[in-house]
Design a protein with these regions (language model features):
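Active-site core segments that coordinate phosphate-bearing ligands/cofactors
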Residues: 7-192, 197-280
Length: 280
């Protein structure tokens, strides 16, 4: 327990004076907790306005270029190292939203946008998008690359190609950052995520599983649930984290499709080459 609620604060919040304060965390460690990501090798991810891959490391390690952030996870202790390694990409869902508002047919829904993108083959017939239009990216050593479209051919590409290339570009940025995490000794075999935001897109899920070779597990949970569970664990309402998350419901599993892997990896290499030229 970290303290008790003061009377002045309790009255503002409509809570009882003396309520125990047993848990606090940043948004991504809390999201990881909501997915029961607590032990070395376990991975949580989000795909909102920005995107995050958050892994737990059981040993002290860091990226010498500071492209990812390392800090104590919610269950770290002096005798049991549990460090969170956070990869953050600013230009994720915000790019997909931009395409929906400015490129796709007016009034289109996100499911319809996904269906439009699905009419285009993997690799978007040579079209690549670097999704870095939401500020400098830490994983690119804080360089301001901006968003850019590469390989555009007026005789081949249309709105559907841009819709698919945007999601593939987002996925490839995840892959680029996950390779940095791999260099730190974090082996990413399974990604856990809430069933929300870009993880609702079949194209995004399929591409992420395909290019990284990871299994994606989707759960019916969110950060608010994680915070409540964390407070319950701290207050002793649950005897253990295992008890707290016994009811966590897995609702979908996406396996890498071996028949598509080469196509995704080939498209990633084209994308990566274009990124490296932009960084030069």
């Amino acid at each position: 327990m970290q303290g008790e609620l003061l009377g002045s604060v309790a009255s503002e919040l409509g809570l009882k004076k003396g309520t125990p304060v047993t848990y606090r965390a940043g948004d991504q460690p809390n999201n990881a907790l909501s997915l029961n990501v607590l032990n070395p090798g376990e991975i949580a991810a989000t795909g909102g306005t920005s995107g995050v891959v958050y892994g737990v490391n059981g040993k002290v390690n860091y990226d010498t270029l500071s492209r990812v952030n390392t800090f104590a996870h919610v269950n770290h202790s002096a005798d049991r190292t549990r460090l969170g390694v956070l990869l953050c990409i600013n230009g994720v869902g915000i790019l997909n939203s931009w395409v929906k508002r400015n490129v796709a047919p007016e009034g289109i829904s996100y499911p319809a946008l996904n269906e439009l993108a699905a009419t285009v083959p993997i690799g978007s017939e040579g079209l690549s998008i670097l999704p870095f239009g939401n500020g400098a990216e830490r994983m690119l050593q804080n360089k301001q690359v901006d968003c850019s479209i590469h390989g555009l051919n007026f005789n081949i590409h249309n709105k559907a190609h841009i819709a698919r290339a945007a999601q593939e570009g987002i996925v490839f940025s995840f892959k680029y950052g996950m390779d940095i995490m791999n260099e730190m000794g974090i082996d990413i075999g399974v990604i856990r995520a809430g069933n929300a935001n870009l993880f609702l897109s079949p194209i995004f899920r399929d591409a992420l599983a395909g290019v990284t070779g990871t299994v994606i597990e989707l759960y019916d949970t969110n950060g608010a649930v994680g915070a409540a569970k964390g407070a319950g664990i701290g207050a002793g309402i649950y005897a253990s984290a295992e008890e707290a998350f016994a009811s966590l419901k897995k609702i979908n599993v996406i396996e890498p499709d071996g028949l598509k892997a080469d196509k995704y990896c080939g498209a990633f290499e084209v994308w990566k080459e274009r990124l490296e030229k932009a960084l030069a």
